[in-house]
């Protein structure tokens, strides 16, 4: 079972800045979480993310894990090239009552790390072999990515971008979840809105949503589909 853990605003600690560590950090960058990296060495990619203020980095040789106790992370990931150290990192996470992950030992970890198809940091599709074969998971991801990038259209991505705007508006005056859901589905059928989303005119799309919303909530009125 694949679970999408909600990490927004939470602290995730990654220990180890090699290839595996950077792979995990790239995935975390899409989650709008706080990323704290500890590694013995830096590299150009780490320096770039630090300069962009996407991660916090501390150059540190790990000999004792007690320094972690001053933090309150939701997750600690051991991504070093030392299997025993990664296991200790996982156990430290358990002692601190947070999720733990050891990169080369997924069977003892709280979760396996799936191979992700990431489309414009909006849609993520996970492919997992439950830690049994990362090579095959990567193979499937590469093949599936070509298909999904054809299936998921530009207007679909733009609809996701403005979805929160429409949903927040709906919550102000549409009283029940079922009615709000009905309103949200109705937006997908509006030709003017679809054209705005297709051409990337998100400002015009929001204006159109406001018009449709006003029609929907008009006292004693009936939603007028002006397609």
Where does each model-flagged region fall?
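Short acidic/histidine-rich motifs immediately flanking catalytic phosphotransfer sites
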Residues: 53, 71-75
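ADP-ribose/adenylate-binding Rossmann-like module
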Residues: 75-82, 86-113
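Glycine-rich adenosine-cofactor-binding loop
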Residues: 3-29, 39, 158-170
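Conserved SAM/SAH-binding loop
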Residues: 60-65
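NAD(P)-binding Rossmann-fold cofactor-contacting core
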Residues: 23, 31-49
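An accessory alpha-helical subdomain
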Residues: 129-227
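Residue-level detector of alpha-helix initiation sites
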Residues: 18-20, 83-84, 131
């Amino acid at each position: 079972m694949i679970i999408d853990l909600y990490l927004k605003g939470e602290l995730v600690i990654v220990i180890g800045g090699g290839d595996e560590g950077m792979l995990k950090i790239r995935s975390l960058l899409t989650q709008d979480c706080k990323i704290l990296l500890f590694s013995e060495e830096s590299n150009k990619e780490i320096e770039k993310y630090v300069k962009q203020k996407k991660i916090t980095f501390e150059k540190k040789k790990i000999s004792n894990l007690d320094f972690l106790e001053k933090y309150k992370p939701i997750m600690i990931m051991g991504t070093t090239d030392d299997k025993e150290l990664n296991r200790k990192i996982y156990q430290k996470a358990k002692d601190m009552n947070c999720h733990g992950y050891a990169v080369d030992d997924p069977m003892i970890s709280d979760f396996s790390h799936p191979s992700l198809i990431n489309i414009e940091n909006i849609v993520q599709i996970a492919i997992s072999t439950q830690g049994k074969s990362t090579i095959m998971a990567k193979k499937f991801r590469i093949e599936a990515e070509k298909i999904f990038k054809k299936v998921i259209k530009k207007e679909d991505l733009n609809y996701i971008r403005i979805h929160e705007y429409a949903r927040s508006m709906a919550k102000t005056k549409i009283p029940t979840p079922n009615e709000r859901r009905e309103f949200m589905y109705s937006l997908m059928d509006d030709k003017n809105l679809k054209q705005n989303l297709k051409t990337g005119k998100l400002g015009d799309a929001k204006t159109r949503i406001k018009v449709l919303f006003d029609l929907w909530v008009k006292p004693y009125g009936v939603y007028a589909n002006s397609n």
